[in-house]
Amino acid sequence: MTDINFGHIHIKLADLMKKQGISISKLAFRSETQRTQLKAYIRNDIQRVDLAVLARLCYALECSLDDLVEYIPPQDTHHS
């Protein structure tokens, strides 16, 4: 496999929680998601995104997926 930088995905959960003034405990309750899993999403420490979790977070935070997830393009924009 080639060593290509495709950029990365940033989960903006911490920003949304701060903006809405919601605690991790309240979000865990509203989204029916474990606190440990939420902490991983807050730290952007996930390798495989669970679409069901994203749907529950969007529902609980009353936001769109676009509000929650952002694609960060690579710094080097030269494609081969």
Predicted regions and their residues:
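Short, charged recognition helix plus adjacent turn
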Residues: 2, 7, 40, 69-80
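Residue-level detection of the helix-turn-helix DNA-binding "recognition helix"
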Residues: 18, 43, 73
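The alpha-helix within a helix-turn-helix
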Residues: 17, 28, 58
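Phosphate-coordinating loops and pocket residues in cytosolic domains that bind phosphorylated ligands
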Residues: 29, 43, 70
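Short, basic-rich loop-to-helix N-cap that marks the start of a DNA-contacting helix
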Residues: 45-56
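A short, Lys/Arg-rich alpha-helix, primarily the initiator
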Residues: 1-25
